[in-house]
From Swiss-Prot:
<dbReference type="Pfam" id="PF12937">
    <property type="entry name" value="F-box-like"/>
</dbReference>
<feature type="domain" description="F-box">
    <location>
        <begin position="1"/>
        <end position="42"/>
    </location>
</feature>
<dbReference type="InterPro" id="IPR036047">
    <property type="entry name" value="F-box-like_dom_sf"/>
</dbReference>
<dbReference type="InterPro" id="IPR001810">
    <property type="entry name" value="F-box_dom"/>
</dbReference>
<dbReference type="InterPro" id="IPR044207">
    <property type="entry name" value="At5g39250-like"/>
</dbReference>
<protein>
    <recommendedName>
        <fullName>F-box protein At5g39250</fullName>
    </recommendedName>
</protein>
Length: 252
């Protein structure tokens, strides 16, 4: 085993990652490497100005190095303050000015999705719905049809049962894109977030109409809609992220 004097001469020459690895070798190495002098040397390499103080900006130089030396890419979210049990979604869909669907959807229904997919949907759409990315899907009950040659728009509001507040997600957005290969009609809206988040913008809510497979999809035909999908896949890929995003809405 190396003598203590040898280690004390070598440790200041190491890079931070190597010094941290040395702490796991044995108790002797760990006790020596925990000396804050070595971590002051590491901080001096990365941020020379912090050593102009008489003491570290944080409790120790070791804590400062461990906290700020690497960019944390995957930070765990705290538990969301909202739950789907306390949410209700109001979805209204118009074909031109004719109301074709109006649904009060409990949050848990959107969370649970469509348990049994109907027969007659395309394999592409079936694969899309089976992907692991988080999406909220609900059956269209009752089923409805929309003409391809008419403008179809949608509004979505969400209410909180725990505070009697409502927020807007989508405001009469038009389904101006029909993905005929995946049997979806898509619309989006940029979210209105609370003024508490002034530096966040450009987050979209996407809503899709899921329709049955048809042999001949011409411009004069009808789309048989069996489901509605809502997601925020630009930024939110998990249930927790979706709930935090909903919590950030401009609740009134």
């Amino acid at each position: 085993m190396f003598s203590e004097e040898v280690l004390k001469n070598v440790f200041p020459l190491l890079e931070g990652e190597d010094l941290a690895s040395c702490m796991g070798v044995c108790k002797q190495w760990r006790d020596i490497a925990r000396d804050d002098f070595y971590w002051k040397c590491q901080c001096a390499k990365k941020w020379p100005s912090v050593c102009k103080r008489h003491k570290p900006p944080t409790e120790t130089y070791y804590k400062m190095y461990q906290t700020f030396s690497k960019r944390r890419l995957n930070r765990a979210l705290p538990p969301p303050r909202l739950s789907f049990e306390n949410l209700e979604f109001f979805i209204d869909i118009w074909s031109e000015e004719r109301l074709v669907f109006s649904g009060l959807i409990p949050g848990v229904a959107l969370e649970n999705g469509i348990e049994t997919l109907p027969l007659g949907i395309s394999n592409v759409l079936r694969t899309h719905l089976g992907r692991p990315d988080y999406k909220m899907v609900v059956p269209a009950e009752p089923r409805f049809t929309i003409p391809l040659n008419q403008s179809v728009s949608v509004s979505v509001l969400v209410a909180r049962n725990d505070s009697d507040k409502v927020a807007r997600i989508i405001n009469r957005s038009v389904f101006d894109y029909i993905d005929r290969s995946s049997y979806r009609a898509l619309a989006f809206e940029y979210l209105d977030l609370s003024p508490c988040y002034p530096f966040i913008s450009g987050i979209r809510a996407w809503i899709s109409l899921l329709f049955m497979d048809v042999e001949d999809m011409n411009d004069d035909g009808l789309l048989d809609v069996f489901g509605i999908q809502l997601d925020f896949n630009d930024v939110a890929d998990t249930k927790e992220e979706v709930l935090w995003l909903l919590d950030m809405l401009d609740w009134k």
